[in-house]
Swiss-Prot record:
It catalyses: (4R,5S)-dethiobiotin + (sulfur carrier)-SH + 2 reduced [2Fe-2S]-[ferredoxin] + 2 S-adenosyl-L-methionine = (sulfur carrier)-H + biotin + 2 5'-deoxyadenosine + 2 L-methionine + 2 oxidized [2Fe-2S]-[ferredoxin]. Catalyzes the conversion of dethiobiotin (DTB) to biotin by the insertion of a sulfur atom into dethiobiotin via a radical-based mechanism. SUPFAM superfamilies: Radical SAM enzymes. GO terms for biological process: biotin biosynthetic process. [2Fe-2S] cluster binds at residues 106, 138, 198, 270. Binds 1 [4Fe-4S] cluster. The cluster is coordinated with 3 cysteines and an exchangeable S-adenosyl-L-methionine. PANTHER family: BIOTIN SYNTHASE, BIOTIN SYNTHASE, MITOCHONDRIAL. Homodimer. This is Biotin synthase. [4Fe-4S] cluster binds at residues 61, 65, 68. The keyword Transferase applies.
Amino acid sequence: MTTTERSDPAIRHDWTVAQVQAIHDMPLLDLVHRASLVHRAHHDPSDIQRASLLSIKTGGCPEDCGYCSQSAHHKETGVARQRLMPVEAVLREAAAAKAAGATRFCMGAAWRSPKDGPDFDAVLAMVRGVRGLGMEACVTLGMLTPSQAERLAEAGLTAYNHNLDTGPDYYDKIVSTRSYEDRLATLQAVRDAGIGVCCGGIIGMGEGVTDRVAMLQVLANHAPHPESVPINALAAVPGTPLGERPPVDPFEMVRMCATARIVMPRARVRLSAGRRALSREAQVLCFLAGANSIFYGERLLTTANTDADADAQLLRDIGVPVPAISALEAAE
């Protein structure tokens, strides 16, 4: 636990699943009100971070995650395997994202775990380059060894994303090639290296409410809390085992954002995949409930994202300052 967490009575690391579920199951208006109070006590409500996400190495992943279009196990998703992007190309994308208003640049590689060598060295150069632009840098590369986490920390990495996906009791129905303990070990290596943890999960995969809140309980009981918690709604991709799942009720996203905010008061709650399916009003309700970050740009790895100009207009409409330049203009 950090010194800041010790001095804040709202920070806890002893939640039970039943306690977290009792919060999640509150009447929705009461839940949003409570989450909003916690949010305003710990954050500027007009500060909604824009992060940009780029797939720097796409497809061919040996993992069998049931939701993922990049798994080599799912042959009919239409995602072709590609090599790692050149460093210079990635940094051009980062510069365009910064010009469009993003303050964090996230890079994802479809690996089970990175191998030491030229590709990992290139990722380190990308991290250094993004930091040199004055942006926060986040990567998601799969499982890490402690020495790899230390090298990323030395390169200046702000945060490492490694999602738990769901609660521990439902996890093996989604993934069989990587255990829950594997994921927790990588998160510990990241913490030990002094890198911020970005960790959340996905709803809409057939799990129950208890599985959702169990995931939040695991995260909230880590010390320190993750610096950011992505809340994703399943983007059902044809050709994956979960490709026929129905869409998530928007109120379920609101509940997850609000619950995450209450049990992890200082974390950034990142409204992530599935946001494209939410109305403007549903997104604003998520912001009121404590979400204070979005992915800004046309794509989230291999799936479409909300139009960048529409995002800019929404943020302006609710009083959040954004640059006048659009993402499309920045890339030209």
